[in-house]
């Protein structure tokens, strides 16, 4: 049985005549003046241990797909089956979403670190706040994850004191801290200078060798050819 299967994922974005007006406001639903079908019945299967790279140009819907899979966007239609449990991507309730997110992690293109927190605090925030883990236990996990990405000596540094590549490695450490079964990567190196890309790819290569399941969206064809990825 596949770890992750998605079937029939659809998502459209609509433009309305009056900015800010959305369906259901003031008692009736306005009709969109234009629509853009971003996802048109996407199907995908990911096996445990796979590294799947979704390649495409900017604006092709790659990031939208990833955000729909983690309920950062609501799809118009589609199902996601994870470890045998099915989720309706258009209608899942909060409890179902929370249950799924405990098994997944998301690495953002622009890191999404808290600017006022240290590297270690960024890694442990979710463990302490969302999972109610004791601080000393969370810190132990956080330091282990920072060591894994080669940044144990930067635990007390703030994002402004780190390079882009280091910030993205902190973001990967944060993802790993939640012990996910799969990590979604949204263009993880596209915001980096070429000389910093290698350090992030090295961490991802290590994770692939350890059997971490990863779904990566990117427009950089060459960068991911050594991650044992199959492309779609």
Where are these regions (language model features)?
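Helix N-cap at the start of a conserved alpha-helix in ABC-type nucleotide-binding domains
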Residues: 194-196
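The feature captures the beta-strand-to-loop junction immediately N-terminal to the Walker
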Residues: 55-57
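Helix-to-loop junction immediately C-terminal to a conserved catalytic motif
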Residues: 70
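Conserved small/polar residues in nucleotide/adenosyl-binding loops
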Residues: 189, 225-232
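ABC ATPase NBD coupling module
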Residues: 87-105, 135-136
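Conserved signature/switch motifs of ABC ATPase nucleotide-binding domains
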Residues: 157-160, 178, 210
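Catalytic Walker B motif of ABC-type/P-loop ATPase nucleotide-binding domains
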Residues: 183-186
């Amino acid at each position: 049985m596949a770890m992750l299967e998605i079937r029939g994922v659809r998502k459209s974005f609509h433009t309305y005549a009056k900015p800010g007006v959305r369906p259901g406001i003031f008692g009736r639903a306005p009709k969109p003046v234009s629509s853009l079908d971003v996802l048109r019945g996407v199907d995908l299967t990911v096996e445990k241990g796979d590294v799947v790279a979704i390649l495409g140009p900017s604006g092709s819907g790659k990031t939208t797909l990833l955000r729909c899979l983690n309920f950062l966007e609501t799809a118009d239609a589609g199902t996601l089956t994870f470890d045998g449990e099915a989720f309706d991507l258009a209608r899942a309730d909060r409890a179902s979403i929370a249950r799924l997110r405990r098994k997944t992690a998301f690495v953002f293109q622009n890191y999404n670190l808290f600017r006022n927190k240290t590297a270690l605090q960024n890694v442990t925030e979710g463990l302490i706040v969302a999972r109610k883990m004791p601080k000393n236990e969370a810190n132990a996990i956080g330091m282990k994850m920072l060591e894994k990405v080669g940044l144990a000596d930067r635990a007390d540094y703030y994002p402004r004191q780190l390079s882009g590549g280091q910030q993205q490695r902190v973001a990967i450490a944060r993802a790993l801290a939640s012990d996910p079964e799969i990590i979604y990567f949204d263009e993880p190196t596209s915001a980096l200078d070429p000389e910093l890309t290698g350090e992030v790819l090295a961490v991802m290569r290590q994770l692939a060798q350890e059997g971490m399941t990863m779904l990566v969206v990117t427009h950089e064809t060459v960068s991911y050819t050594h991650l044992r990825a199959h492309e779609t």
